[in-house]
């Protein structure tokens, strides 16, 4: 049996409801059609507000990771550009702006409020394996201190994760990293590596270095690999450090280019679902809305993966929004959204979603 609170919040995202009134009225309008969702009646406005304020957001976090365990393997895509076989994770954070007068706990700047979603995205499935929701004022590297570390995997991140004590811990755990380094990085070159002929136009530098700043060197005394590439699309040089010395420079460059996938994930969850504005003002309510958005996008990516039709995620969300209370054979609709479904056999019963 599904929780009415979970069903309400999933409806909030699928229907892009802007208030508890919209959620309650929307579900009430589906009288008789809620049984397949695992609830008997639509919750009231006060019930939704109370549950969002009092029910521990970690319950929804647990639901997300349980579903990820069950459905995550289905969402994995075949690698095309990346030739390495190790696990790849993309690390970044995104800010969600809030009105400080309404969300006074969400400190960010003097007159601005925000929460920050620190995220470790699994590359093949494009789904988070770690999310830490904090106040907007928490630095990116601090929000990533407890990310899971998988030996032999590689973590790709931007310059905000130039935290040498943290990188030293990753290295000690057998984790590779590809990090864009800051422009003011102080280092000494130990050895210039030969540039590949085919990559000479985009790969500008491949060298082994040690940090020369005494404080930084104390935090990360081992040698590093530094690769500089030319980003022709944005007309800029990108300089990266890594602790992997066996991959081709072109592999390190391609790994960093794939970091864009986490930006796409953040764009999708903000534009397609409902986390730009919030139906509750407490920290718990905000976290519940974010975790249920993650549950929703996991369900969407699973549906996309089992469909024969080549859905774009945005189109799938739009079609579900238009047909949210239409009784359909889900698999048939996913496979052939523009065809009339066959007539349901007698004594046919709709399955339970949860």
Describe each region flagged by the PLM.
Residues 1-22, 26, 53-55, 62-66, ...:
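Single, function-defining residue in the core of a domain
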Residues 36-57, 65:
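Major-groove recognition helix of helix-turn-helix-like DNA-binding domains
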Residues 36-37, 76-78, 105-108:
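Catalytic micro-motifs at enzyme active sites that drive phosphoryl/nucleotidyl and oxygen chemistry
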Residues 46-50, 71-75, 337-343:
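Short alpha-helical linear motifs
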Residues 71-82, 98:
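Long amphipathic N-terminal alpha/beta scaffold segment
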């Amino acid at each position: 049996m599904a929780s009415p609170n979970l069903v309400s919040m999933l409806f909030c995202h699928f229907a892009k409801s802007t208030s508890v009134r919209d959620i309650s009225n929307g579900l009430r309008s589906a009288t008789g059609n809620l049984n397949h969702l695992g609830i008997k009646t639509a919750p009231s406005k006060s019930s939704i507000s109370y549950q969002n304020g009092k029910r521990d957001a970690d319950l929804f976090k647990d639901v997300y990771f349980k579903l990820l365990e069950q459905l995550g393997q289905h969402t994995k895509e075949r690698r095309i550009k990346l030739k390495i076989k190790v696990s790849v994770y993309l690390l970044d954070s995104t800010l969600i702006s809030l009105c400080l007068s309404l969300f006074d706990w969400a400190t960010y700047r003097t007159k601005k409020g925000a929460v920050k979603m620190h995220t470790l995205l699994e590359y093949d499935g494009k789904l988070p394996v770690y999310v830490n929701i904090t106040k907007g004022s928490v630095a990116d590297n601090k929000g990533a201190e407890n990310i899971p570390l998988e030996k032999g995997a590689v973590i790709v991140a931007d310059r905000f994760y130039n935290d040498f004590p943290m990188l030293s811990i990753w290295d000690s755990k057998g984790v590779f990293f590809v990090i864009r380094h800051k422009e003011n990085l102080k280092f000494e070159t130990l050895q210039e590596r030969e540039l590949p002929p085919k990559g000479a136009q985009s790969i500008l530098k491949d060298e082994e270095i040690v940090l020369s700043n005494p404080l930084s060197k104390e935090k990360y005394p081992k040698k590093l690999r530094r690769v500089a590439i030319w980003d022709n699309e944005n007309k800029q040089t990108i300089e990266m450090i890594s602790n992997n010395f066996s991959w081709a420079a072109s592999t390190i460059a391609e790994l960093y280019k794939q970091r864009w996938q986490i930006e796409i994930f953040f764009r999708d969850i903000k534009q397609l679902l409902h986390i730009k504005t919030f139906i509750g003002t407490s920290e718990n309510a905000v976290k519940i809305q974010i975790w249920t958005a993650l549950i929703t996008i996991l369900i969407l990516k699973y549906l996309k993966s089992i469909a024969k039709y080549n859905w774009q995620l945005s189109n799938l969300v739009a079609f579900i929004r238009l047909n949210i209370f239409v009784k359909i054979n889900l698999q048939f609709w996913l496979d052939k959204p523009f065809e009339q479904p066959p007539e349901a056999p007698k004594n046919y019963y709709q399955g339970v979603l949860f």
